[in-house]
Amino acid sequence: MPSIEAVGAREILDSRGNPTVEVEVVLEDGTLGRAAVPSGASTGAFEAVELRDGGDRYGGKGVTKAVEAVIGRIGPAIMELEATEQRLLDATLIDLDGTPGKSALGANALLGVSLAVAKAAAASSGLPLFRYLGGPSAHLLPVPMMNILNGGAHADTNVDIQEFMIAPIGAGTFAESLRWGAEIYQALKSVLKGRGLATGVGDEGGFAPSLPTNREALDLIAEAIDKAGFGLGDDIALALDVASTEFFADGSYTFEGSGRSAEQMIDYYADLVDSYPIVSIEDPLAEDDWAGWTSITTRLGARVQLVGDDLFVTNPERLARGIAEGAANALLVKVNQIGTLTETLDAVNLAHRSGYRCMMSHRSGETEDTTIADLAVAVDCGQIKTGAPARSERVAKYNQLLRIEEELDDAARYAGAGAFPRRTTTG
């Protein structure tokens, strides 16, 4: 297999107008791999650390230090490594950084290199990325968890829950699921206009109206599903990303204007699950509220998927603790939370071995890079979260999944309702 011959990097812009890192790796056979690194708005305290410049330039968010780290430190250290030696490459990156949170060189620098090398190796092998990473059996297309209504840190409104998602579980193919989602998205816009509500969009393409309660958001989505001609529950399920760490402080959750305990939050979620066909709730409790997580998993874990994002930060060590303590039953997978492809794959493998579901995810600050679409198929996630069917940095991932489904042809399988074995018919 060709070895690494050249490594370059540059500062580019993400979908929120903030700088991010793009890395290019060239192999000795001339093959090029390019990867751009995403960035989050609501970030977990235990995520790997992005290296930012500080100062006045780009409001302190420049990434020239990370670019310099790629060119000056990382590139020389990995030159002549074989591109297929992903685990060795990533171990070299981790050792070179030498800090637990990857703060010396920056997780944004390390991840860009890690992904660019994988893409170069795939191209050199003559394989699409999903096939190179997943092998000959990779064929499962994920259910798109479309964030069509935004609140929380993704929108400047008084809606506490960060993401209200639709899951087209009744579709027969990924292409059909995407069409259903797009039709519901347009129907929701019409419903909002009819109510005199704002139709501006948040970071991830979902609408961001100011609403009196979080339930109102669910009711508007239910109306849009009906308006588009689909059935709530059988055709389209609902999902939430609460991002509750964002409103947790001093042991209390400030939610809909009042302080609530973990048990009161769990009561609230139980009522929602009783009232709506909700198949997944992400980060219902805060990243350090382990007791609360164990409690909600005991109470609701048999009925609904409980996804750890800030709780696990795609970190195998934190996931192992959650498995041991019975906290959550699914892992959100964000490659930039951990900083290398190998560590991401290790977290996914641990989740699968332990009976935890996995949901591949974008970040609120995205680029046109489509790596996560291939990765979702490669590791049999069965679920992907990459925003509304709008904004080109979101649609890029969906379009890549369309291409993958077309390439797989008769071998392609759409995960559908099977991605949510805990699903009930409530709603």
Curated annotation (Swiss-Prot):
Might you give the EC number(s) for this enzyme? 4.2.1.11
> Which BP terms from GO are recorded?
glycolytic process
Which cofactor(s) are needed, names only?
Mg(2+)
Q: Supply the InterPro entries for this chain.
A: Enolase, Enolase-like_C_sf, Enolase-like_N, Enolase_C, Enolase_CS, Enolase_N
Instruction: Tell me the residue numbers annotated for binding Mg(2+).
Output: D241, E282, D309
| Known catalytic reactions | (2R)-2-phosphoglycerate = phosphoenolpyruvate + H2O
Record carries keyword Transmembrane: no
Q: Where in the cell is it found?
A: Cytoplasm; Secreted; Cell surface
Q: What is this protein called?
A: Enolase
**Gene Ontology MF terms in the entry:** magnesium ion binding; phosphopyruvate hydratase activity
UniProt enzyme class: lyase
